[in-house]
Amino acid sequence: LHRAVEHAPDPPGHVARRGIVRSYQISSVFPHLTVIENVRIALQRSTGLSFQFWRSESILDSMNARALELLDQVDLRGFAGVETVSLPYGRKRALEIATTLATEPELMLLDEPTQGMGHEDVARVTDLIKRVAVGRTVLMVEHNMSVVSSIANTITVLARGSVLAEGPYQAVSNNPAVKEAYMGTSETELEGMAH
């Protein structure tokens, strides 16, 4: 439910046009296109140019300025001409965030955005999420507690499909029911349990 509208039965394209975009746990970019070409594809919908099999290069080039702005936001301008397949995983996730930003979303849904990343990429993507969250809502599934503690304003902990606790990180991380459910004892600190 977003803005009092149920979106579950709607096709993804309709949901995206309402300002809701999602990014899956597995990176979904076009591997054999360049970084800027990936962003231009995302921009076609928001600029009124729906994706078609063929577009003249001049029409696509007209989107380069906005595509480069988006790449600046995610620190990928220097990779604009690079084929996406050669990017490290963390940079691919940043590219995916740039493509979601192309739709100018109000609400971003991120599924474990730092899953499978090395420490350097985790820090880079965490910082990126903080920056792009300004002025929009980000709903994120994340199991890395250091990421959660540095990004989230409000945390909701689920156990077996039910809300176990909700609130700021400090309150939730010290909640005995949360500790019991996830650590097996209420004496264990969640703080150091990042993975």
Predicted regions and their residues:
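Glycine-rich phosphate-binding loops of nucleotide-dependent enzymes
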Residues: 1-195
